C-alpha cells in the first residue's frame, strides 16, 4: 500500500459495523481503507452465533434493502432458520438464523475482497490526527500515519476492554484479542462524554459430552426461510437442529452460594450490563421465584464440536462454572472448551452525535456500533451502513441522510440513541417503533431500496430485481381494484368462506376477508390474475388486509410531519426561550435537537415546552 495515499474514508474495526461501513463507503465510489487488528477475524461473531430475531431481523432486512452484506452472509452461513412470532401479525414476525461462525466470516470476507474502491490492511489504531477541529488521519500501532478526509470508528468492545472471570481480570477486547488501550486514552483526551458498559458470554461446551436425549429438539422451519431479498434456499448450507434444556434447583443453589465470587455482585465491575440479555447470576437473583430457566443449546458450526448454551452467560470463577453447568439437564458430563466471561469497555454518549452518526465535536469523525452504547451484531451493522454512507456523502459534498422513525427501524435506533442516549446496552425491539405496522420485515425493500439507489448504495442486480417485484405488486393491485367478485362465486369458495357474500365486491375488498388468500382468487379464471412468488402474494395480501390500519398510521405520520419539518437552529440558545424550566433548558442545550419533533422525544420536554419553543421561533422570526 502507498503510505502517502490520502484515503477518502478510513474505517477502524472489522466487525459488523466496520464491514458494513467500509462496504457502504466504497459502494458510493470513494477510496476506502478498512483497518482491522486481524484480517482473519473480519465479520467475527464474538458472542452468539446467530443473526436476527425480534426487531433485529427487521434491521437485517433494512440493511439488505440498502444492499448491505449481513443478510447475504446469513443466507450463506445459516444452518437453521426460523420465523419467530409466525402465528402473530406481520408487524412482529421476524427471521432468525443460527449461523456457522466460519462460514459467516468467509462470506463477509468474500464480499469485502470483491468490493471495488476498498483496501484492507491489518493494523490496530492507537491515535487520531486532529487538525483545525477535523480528523486528518490515524496513527497505527507500529507508528504509521494514514491520512483520510473522514474516519469511521467501529471498535466494538475493544476500547479499554477488561475481561472478568471471577475475581481475576485482564485487559482484552474479547477472549484471545488485545484491547485498544491507547486509542481509548486518545479519545478520552478529546473530552468526549464517556462511560463504561458491560456484556458477557457463556462457557462453550463440547457437543460430544452432551446427552441430547434429555433435551427437546428444536428443528428449523420448512420451507427454509431466507434473509436477503436476493437470496434463495439453495444459498443455505446443511441445516441442523438446536435443542432446549433447563437449569435445575441445584444449578441455582450453586450460583446463589457463590455470588460473592461474581465480579458484578462484588462491585468489581462498574459497567452496566444488557437488560435483555442478563447473566445467569442476574436471572437467579432477579427472578428468585423461578425454579428453572430455559437454555437454547445451539451449534457453533458444521465443522466444530463446540456448542453455545444460550442463556447462561456468566462471569463466575471457572471452577464454579464447571460445577453449575454439570447440574443442567443433559450437561452432567459436559466438558467446557472455553470459559464464560464478562467484558467491560468504553462507550461514548450517543447524544454527542448527529442523526448522521458524525460527532458534533469533530464533524468528519463518525461512530458506529458498540462505541455508541448498543449491543448486538444487527444494531452495529445498521449503524455501520449509515455511518459509512454518510462519511462518503460528506466527502462527495452531497446531503447526508438518515431514515426517519416512520421510515425504518434504523431510524428508530439512531433517533433513540441521539435523542435519549442510553445508560445500558441498547437492544432493538419492535415495541420501540411507533409505526411498526408500516415497518415490517416483508416491506423493507419497498421502504428503502429506491432511496438507496438514489444515494448510490444499491447496485444494478438488486435494483433490477426490486423493480420487477414492485411492478408485479402494483400491476396486480391495479387488477384487484378493477376486478369484481360476484355473489354467484359463493359456490366456488364455499369451502373457505366463513360467511357467504351478500353482494358483489371488488377483488381487493374480497381479499380483506381473513379466510381468503391470493391462491383463492386464482381459482377465478375470469380475473386473469398472474401466478406470483410467495413473497409478492404475501405483500399483496398484507397491503389489502391491513389497509385501514396502514392508512390510519399514515395519517398519524402526516400530522406529526409538521413538527418534523419545524427545524430548530443549531445556534439557538435555549436560555433565551422564556418560560422553559432549567431541566428542559439544560437538556435542549446539551442535545441540540434538529427539529421540534426530536425535541418532543427528549425525556422531560413537555407539550407546554414545545409550545414555548414555537412561540419563540415565531417571535424571533426564525423559520418555522
Swiss-Prot record:
Record's keyword annotation contains Chloroplast: no
Organism: Legionella pneumophila (strain Lens)
UniProt-recorded name of the protein: tRNA uridine 5-carboxymethylaminomethyl modification enzyme MnmG
One Pfam family in the UniProt entry: GIDA
Residues reported in the UniProt entry to bind FAD: 13-18, 125, 180, 370
Cell location: Cytoplasm
Functional note: NAD-binding protein involved in the addition of a carboxymethylaminomethyl (cmnm) group at the wobble position (U34) of certain tRNAs, forming tRNA-cmnm(5)s(2)U34.
Signal peptide: none
Record GO terms (molecular function): flavin adenine dinucleotide binding
PROSITE patterns: GIDA_1, GIDA_2
